[in-house]
């Protein structure tokens, strides 16, 4: 190592000091001035941790005055370098720049410059970088992108709808699944796919006020999508940043009432540029031909300005035909322009539905059915398929022929592309509900206080009195004060304690109407029997509720009981439990269904035990009997319950207000009869064709199986832990498939993407994540992985490395150079480029003669044979073979030109094949189904020509390289 005054060196250990200049040299020491950081360093001369900075022909360098020079020649004189070349700004030739006058703030951007400047990274980081590029590429190419990372069970019909809709350009659809089938999750999956693919960057979700927090939590917990709730306060705050407050966040959640009430806010929402609008509870938007409601007009105005629209609504039959038409009109006003025409068109689908039902049943087709199918599929020769169905062909061949006919009929189904609707009847796997009605004697304390309350409540309406009589513990407290310990004598509490003791190993969900009742019950269970319980009510923050839910979900050491108030339980699901206690009853059938729906959801593995303790001779008994005998509302889902309740509301309220059973028998009889006839109408109106289409059949199962196969990917686990190590995060094993990850002091960056300041608990196991709300499910799509990969690639982690290969079969000192190139097409994310040409890593492995050995030498197995070299030693090795490395890089560049051409050609071919088949299918469909929107076709044509341009301009650049030297030691 020889030093001369004025030479430029860089520190191996403190590269952020910038470019240093030798200012003093004696026999033993050398002194460097780092002007950029105004620091001096004194090093021992024989072993200074510094690397000489030498540039080569073809490099562009910067002078300390700020102008740049393209280097054409390098002359060394008296130990100092002089660079000669052309000035970039003036094109002046033969400009001379001495190394002493180089810029002090030198930045080495190319990996080879970093290597020669001694900025050599660790070998394990080089491997991590290569794996990050590979995994990023594979994720972008995966057809399941956007569906694997959500924290939700793999339920075929949900995945089918999400896969079908999420890949469309600006989807406009109606999701009308029955209660408990997971519409919110379907919507979340669609949003997630649209966001990941870049098709949607700005999303607006409009929901009823009571559901805002539920949506916020669902989107965050399940999909890692962070929405902001906008209300008047938030809008006022946002004025500092933008004239239109809705422009200050990408993902916005707000209530319909908020936009409806303020003309100004409504106008601002319409003006904000959204890519996707999601409306929950869309059945509340009332419409008729002469006078649509204000709510309907608000959503209509936003939907007109927004390319993608998802409407979540109750089932079409519950809505009534006109109301159902109104939803479809929001999605496509050109197509659904006239109600009478729509009714007529629906009538014409009846034969299609009948034909599909006949095919699906597997029975012999009647001549009538065959004629109908032939007529409907007039442009296709269906005779050969009929022959297969009627022949003695193998069963699966017959099934295939039936399926082909069904698929073709489905494509002609008018609303099949815009409407998805699954019913419990069509989706198997729901548990039984077992009702346990528990009559109990009325305590004298309650009887007295109820009698007095009746005498004193002269001015109360019947409805208020009916509500009051359902909750005797509240009446008792009104007289005795808040400290009244009603739970000491209430027989329901004694019965509950026995139930919990008998079922020590079961999780039990208890729901009471009032938060105060829930809190006092928890106290009673704790004080009287030491039962571990937790409470859940509307007075708690989201975080407090999450903690309570996680404590209840915990298998070991968790709470046996979760006691919820009515409002507190909205939108939370606990399908790991199957014991439900209704400590009291809600006032209407919808709330009852909502209670049972906490456990009776898709994914529930066991039958549900519903326990209803009630006090004899009170309104509780009358209401329990009406729910059970009049509606069978405990035994099965009751889509007709609300309609029956509305019809008999006055009679029900009158009976509950008095607590007398006069007229109850006839009320039950009439309710049951109406319920039966309404259910029969629903059954008749069921659109079986739509159900078949919506649940996706075998295709849906295939999607679920494909995703399940990627769960538990050991490659992901190893990569994630390695990534967290490299960044410098603390990882503590927590057992039960869980790891606690927290930020550390010496991290590579000040804050890590997706990781809260206080850290978080992660798991790689879907089942664990589903039962524990406090855990993050780590997948390739999780922000901690996506953000980590971006961090590694942008921060230049692992861009250079030097390793030793201990192999006596090769001569000592043999050189190998491993280069990783990346092909990149510069294109906007929403163009869809990532599907066909994401950043594509190409590895080249050069031997000393310039032969590419990458096909014979696989990365992982080769990497395991290598050992690391310390930085100082690595720097010496690189300097000794700098010339050879330059030669090998030149050869690699030539070979990359050919590779680039083939990558472009393959991407172009794949893109044309995929988009052409999509286009042809839609064009064929358009001929028979008016639901194909013109803009979908033009969008695909435009996308093809744009993508073709982007792919043709794709460039390649060297991303990272590693020098490998053979050693025998």
Curated annotation (Swiss-Prot):
It holds the Pfam family SNF2-rel_dom. Residues 164-334 form the Helicase ATP-binding domain. InterPro entries: Helicase_ATP-bd, Helicase_C-like, Helicase_RapA, P-loop_NTPase, RapA_C, SNF2-like_sf, SNF2/RAD54-like_C, SNF2_N. Its EC number is 3.6.4.-. ATP binds at residues 177-184. A motif (DEAH box) lies at residues 280-283. It comes from the Bacteria. One of its GO terms (biological process) is regulation of DNA-templated transcription. Keywords: Activator, ATP-binding, DNA-binding, Helicase, Hydrolase, Nucleotide-binding, Transcription, Transcription regulation. GO terms for molecular function: ATP binding; DNA binding; helicase activity; hydrolase activity, acting on acid anhydrides. Residues 492-668 form the Helicase C-terminal domain. PROSITE patterns: HELICASE_ATP_BIND_1, HELICASE_CTER. Belongs to the SNF2/RAD54 helicase family. RapA subfamily. Interacts with the RNAP. Has a higher affinity for the core RNAP than for the holoenzyme. Its ATPase activity is stimulated by binding to RNAP. Transcription regulator that activates transcription by stimulating RNA polymerase (RNAP) recycling in case of stress conditions such as supercoiled DNA or high salt concentrations. Probably acts by releasing the RNAP, when it is trapped or immobilized on tightly supercoiled DNA. Does not activate transcription on linear DNA. Probably not involved in DNA repair. This is RNA polymerase-associated protein RapA. It comes from Aliivibrio fischeri (strain MJ11). The gene is rapA.
């Amino acid at each position: 190592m020889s030093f001369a005054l004025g030479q430029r060196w860089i520190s191996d250990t403190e590269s952020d000091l910038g470019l240093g200049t030798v200012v003093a040299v004696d026999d033993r020491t050398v002194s460097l001035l780092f002007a950029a950081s105004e620091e001096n360093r004194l090093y021992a001369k024989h072993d200074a941790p510094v690397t000489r900075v030498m540039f080569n022909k073809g490099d562009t360098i910067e002078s300390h005055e700020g102008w740049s020079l393209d280097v054409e020649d390098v002359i060394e004189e008296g130990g100092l370098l002089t660079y000669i070349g052309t000035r970039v700004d003036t094109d002046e030739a033969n400009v001379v720049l001495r190394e002493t006058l180089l810029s002090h703030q030198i930045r080495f951007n190319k990996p080879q410059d970093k290597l020669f400047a001694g900025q050599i990274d660790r070998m394990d980081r080089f491997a991590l970088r290569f794996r990050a590029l590979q995994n990023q590429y594979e994720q972008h190419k995966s057809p399941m992108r956007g569906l694997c990372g959500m924290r939700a069970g793999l339920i075929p019909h949900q995945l089918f709808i999400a896969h079908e809709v999420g890949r469309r350009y600006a989807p406009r659809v109606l999701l009308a699944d029955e209660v408990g089938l997971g519409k919110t999750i379907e919507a979340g999956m669609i949003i997630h796919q649209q966001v990941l693919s870049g098709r949607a960057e700005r999303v607006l979700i409009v929901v009823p006020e009571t559901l805002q927090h539920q949506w916020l939590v669902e989107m965050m917990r399940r999909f890692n999508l962070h929405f902001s709730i906008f209300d008047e306060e938030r809008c006022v705050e946002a004025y500092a940043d933008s004239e239109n407050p809705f422009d200050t966040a990408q993902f916005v959640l707000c209530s319909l009432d908020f936009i409806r009430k303020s003309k100004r806010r409504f106008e601002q929402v319409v003006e904000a540029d959204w890519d996707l609008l999601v409306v929950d509870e869309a059945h509340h938007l009332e419409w008729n031909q002469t006078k649509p409601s204000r709510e309907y007009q608000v959503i209509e105005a936003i939907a007109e300005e927004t390319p993608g629209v998802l409407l979540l609504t109750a089932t079409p039959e519950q809505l009534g035909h006109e109301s159902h038409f109104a939803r479809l009109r929001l999605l496509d006003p050109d197509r659904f322009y006239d109600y009478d025409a729509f009714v007529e068109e629906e009538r014409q689908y009846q034969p299609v539905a009948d034909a599909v039902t006949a095919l699906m049943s597997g029975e012999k087709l009647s001549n009538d059915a065959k004629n109908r199918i032939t007529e409907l599929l007039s442009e296709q020769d269906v005779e050969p398929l009929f022959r297969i169905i009627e022949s003695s062909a193998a069963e699966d061949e017959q099934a295939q022929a039936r399926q082909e006919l069904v698929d073709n009929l489905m494509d002609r189904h008018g609303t099949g592309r815009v409407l998805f609707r699954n019913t419990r009847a069509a989706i198997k796997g729901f548990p039984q509900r077992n009702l346990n009605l528990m009559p109990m004697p009325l305590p004298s304390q309650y009887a007295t206080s109820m009698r007095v309350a009746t005498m004193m409540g002269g001015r109360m309406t019947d409805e208020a009195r009916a509500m009051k009589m359902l909750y005797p513990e509240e009446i008792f407290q009104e007289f005795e004060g808040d400290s009244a310990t009603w739970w000491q004598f209430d027989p329901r509490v004694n019965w509950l304690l026995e139930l919990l003791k008998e079922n020590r190993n079961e999780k039990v969900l208890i729901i009471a109407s009032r938060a105060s009742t829930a809190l006092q019950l928890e106290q009673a269970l704790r004080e009287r029997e030491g039962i571990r319980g937790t409470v859940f009510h509307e007075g708690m923050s989201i975080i407090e509720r999450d903690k309570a839910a996680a404590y209840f979900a915990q298998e070991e050491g968790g709470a046996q009981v979760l006691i919820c108030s009515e409002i507190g339980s909205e939108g939370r699901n606990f399908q790991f439990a199957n014991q439900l206690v209704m400590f009291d009853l809600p006032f209407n059938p919808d709330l009852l269904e909502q209670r049972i729906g906490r456990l009776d959801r898709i994914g529930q593995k066991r039958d549900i035990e519903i326990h209803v303790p009630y006090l004899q001779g009170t309104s509780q008994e009358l209401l329990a009997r009406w729910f059970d005998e009049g509606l069978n509302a405990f035994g099965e889902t009751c889509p007709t319950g609300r309609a029956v309740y509305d019809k008999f509301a006055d009679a029900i309220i009158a009976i509950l207000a008095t607590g007398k059973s006069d007229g109850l028998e006839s009320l039950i009889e009439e309710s049951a009869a109406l319920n039966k006839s309404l259910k029969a109408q629903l059954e008749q109106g069921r659109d079986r064709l739509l159900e078949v289409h919506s649940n996706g059949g075998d295709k849906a199962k295939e999607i679920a199986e494909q995703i399940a196969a990627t769960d538990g990917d050991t490659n992901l686990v190893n990569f994630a832990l390695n990534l967290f190590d490299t960044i410098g995060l603390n990882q503590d094993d927590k057992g039960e498939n869980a790891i606690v990850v927290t930020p550390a002091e010496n991290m590579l960056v000040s804050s890590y993407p997706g990781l809260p300041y206080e850290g978080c608990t992660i798991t790689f196991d879907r089942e664990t994540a589903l039962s524990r709300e406090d855990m993050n499910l780590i997948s390739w799509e999780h922000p901690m992985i996506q953000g980590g990969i971006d961090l590694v690639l942008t921060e230049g982690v692992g861009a250079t490395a030097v390793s030793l290969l201990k192999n006596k079969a090769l001569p000592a000192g043999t050189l190998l150079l491993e280069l990783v190139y990346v092909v990149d097409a510069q294109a906007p994310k929403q163009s869809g480029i990532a599907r066909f040409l994401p950043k594509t890593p190409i590895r080249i492995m050069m031997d000393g003669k310039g032969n590419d050995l990458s096909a014979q030498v696989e990365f992982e197995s080769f990497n395991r044979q290598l050992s690391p070299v310390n930085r100082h030693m690595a720097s010496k090795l690189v300097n000794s073979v700098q010339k050879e490395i330059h030669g090998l890089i030149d050869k690699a560049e030539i070979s990359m030109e050919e590779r680039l051409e083939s990558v472009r050609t393959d991407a172009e071919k794949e893109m044309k094949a995929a988009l052409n088949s999509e286009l042809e299918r839609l064009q064929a469909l358009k001929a028979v189904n008016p639901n194909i929107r013109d803009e979908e076709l033009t969008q695909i044509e435009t996308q093809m020509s744009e993508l073709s341009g982007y792919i043709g301009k794709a460039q390649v650049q060297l991303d990272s390289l590693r020098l490998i030297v053979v050693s025998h030691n």
